[in-house]
Amino acid sequence: GVQSSYILWEGIENLGGKVYVTIPDRIKDGYGVNEQLVEAAIEEGADTILTCDNGIAAADALKRAKENGLTVIVTDHHEIPFCEENGERKEILPDADAIVNPKQKDCAYPFKEICGAVVAWHLIRVLYDMTGKGMKQADVFIENAAFATIGDVMELQHENRILVKEGLKRLNQTKSIGMRSLIASNKLDLGGIKAYHIGFVLGPCLNASGRLDTAKKALLLLKTKDEVDAGKLAEELVELNTSRKALTEKGIEDAMQCIETQGLSEDRVLVIYLPDCHESIAGIIAGRVRERYHRPVYV
C-alpha cells in the first residue's frame, strides 16, 4: 500500500486537500483499517476516510466512521467478501459513500486484475479531470502505479502490460528524489532499471520497512523533496532489507532443520513452530518451504 498511499497523498495535496496518512503497523494493527484507527481519525477531527489497497473487508470499522458522520471512500482491488443466500452469492460491502473496486459484481471496468495503486491512480485521474487540473497531469504517477503492479506480481496482460512498459520508461528518467536515492543506494544505474530490479531489489527495500520497522519510512522516502533526507531514508531501507534477508535465510534453515529432526517430511500438511521467527517474515519462510516440499505449509 505504500505506492497507493503516496499516489493519493500527493495527488490530493496537489488539489489543495489536507491529508493525514496512516499505514497500519503490521504487528500491532494487523492488516488494513480497524476500529482503533477509525477512532483516532475521529479524535483528530477528520471529515473523510479514504482507504487505499484495503477497506473492502473492513465493514465493522467503517460502519463506526459512518456512525460518527465521516465521509467514507474505499479504494481497493481485493476480492469482495460474500455470503451465500438461497444458493446465490451476496456481496458484503462496507457502508461507504463510494467504493472503487473493479472486483465488484456490477462494476463495468473491463479489466479486473489491477493492483491497489492503479485503482488509486485512476481515482486521481478522475479527480484531476473533474477539478479542471487535467487528467494528463496525473501521468506523473504512472511510474508509481507500474512499480506497484510489478511488486504485487499482477498479471502482465491488457493495461498492466502497457502501464509497466511506460512506467519503466518513466522510472528510468524519474525526477523523484526519493526514488533516485533508493536506486543509488542499491548501486543501480538510473537508465538501466528493469522489472527484475523492482521485483527483487527496489520493491523489497520498500516492503522491508513495513516488515521490520514502519512502512511510513518508505512512504516518506517517496514524498520527500530533500536530497539529504532521501539519502538517509534510502540507506535505512537498504539496511532493513539486508536484515530482512538474513532473518529470512535463518528462518528457512531453522524450518528445514525442524522438518528433518522432528520427522515431519512425510506429513501431508507441514506445521512448523519457530518461536524466534519474526512474525512479518513467517509467510516468506512458509512460501520457500512449500517450494521445496510441494505441500501446504504453516509457520
Give the residues covered by each predicted segment.
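Hydrophobic helix-and-loop "lid/oligomerization" segment in the mid-to-C-terminal part
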Residues: 1-48, 68, 86-87, 95, ...
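Active-site cavity-forming subdomains of large catalytic enzyme subunits
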Residues: 42-113, 117, 121-130, 140, ...
